[in-house]
Amino acid sequence: LNAAKEAGLEGYVVREAYRSISDQQTLWDAEYNRLKGRHSAWTDDELIAATKKSINLPGTSEYNSGLAFTLYLYENGNDELNKMVFSESEQGKWMYENSWKYGLVFRFPLQDFPTKGTISRAYKTGVNVEMNLFRFVGIPNATVMHHLDMCLEEYIEYLMAHPHIAVFEDGQLKYEIVRQQVGDDSSTFSVSISRKTSNYTMSLDNMGGLITIYEY
């Protein structure tokens, strides 16, 4: 947001960020019961499927990760700004174009949303509603996802098929991204660090893999 401010753009407000499992359960139960009251003949499976169209199951929401948030615009006394649709504003356009430079990705691309020409990834993400949601994945991951035009699900699949990615800048190695399969049921495992760098991070991908990022 400091970079956006330097570009003359302000008014960003975080609408939602971390949401606890219990809060997610409350939202889920409320929507499930609302639908149940309107459709008494529906089976439990039908109610669950309908509820999932607008509310994630507890534990599967992006908000539960603590890494995601939504943005909107507000500035005290600025009615013109406050009425703007984020995706149509200059603030929104700047964020969509530049967020990857700071380790953020737009999480749920749809056809022509957030910007005209965007290709829907709903068939991968499972989300088919307009959500102005960003997720922090780190600059190395966001850089690759941006240049390959991938959503998070596509990126994980790409890493499963190509478990070693090298990113160069001006001819110099900048990042190495390595995925190792450790298994879904592994509570402990060992990893060999063979790169000549002390600056690395590790994270699990919820697909049985460990992603290690080396920065040079």
Locations of regions flagged by a protein language model:
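Cell-envelope/glycan interface and biosynthesis
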Residues: L1-E169, E176-Y216
